[in-house]
């Protein structure tokens, strides 16, 4: 059971993401619907995050920076395709909206595997 931050300004997508994470047995942190709330929630103990690129008038890159600095793996969600993501984040996991459950599950599994790899490296002497 992992603690996963959900950040999306679209209530239907946020609710779907929460439901799917719960169905997969994970603990949902949030959801946050704006950048300020997301930055506050990002201070929690997290295993991963699902982050919408565009949050109303704000972009989520300050949150992506904060998560990266803490070593928290995250996936960016967007309806704009790869060109809608800043170049420095194009190699991160992505979920193109609308996304299906099978794709979502695969991305969550990949994020959690990255987190376990990070923890193993940090624990090594």
Region annotations inferred by a language model:
Residues 16-21, 104:
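Short hydrophobic helical patches associated with two-component signaling proteins
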Residues 26-33:
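Short hydrophobic/Thr-rich beta-strand motif most characteristic of the beta2 strand and flanking loop
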Residues 45-50:
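Active-site beta3 strand of CheY-like receiver
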Residues 51-68:
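Conserved phosphotransfer microenvironments
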Residues 62, 69, 80-97, 102, ...:
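Alpha4 helix (beta4-alpha4-beta5 surface) of REC/receiver domains from two-component response regulators
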Residues 84, 99-125:
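C-terminal output helix
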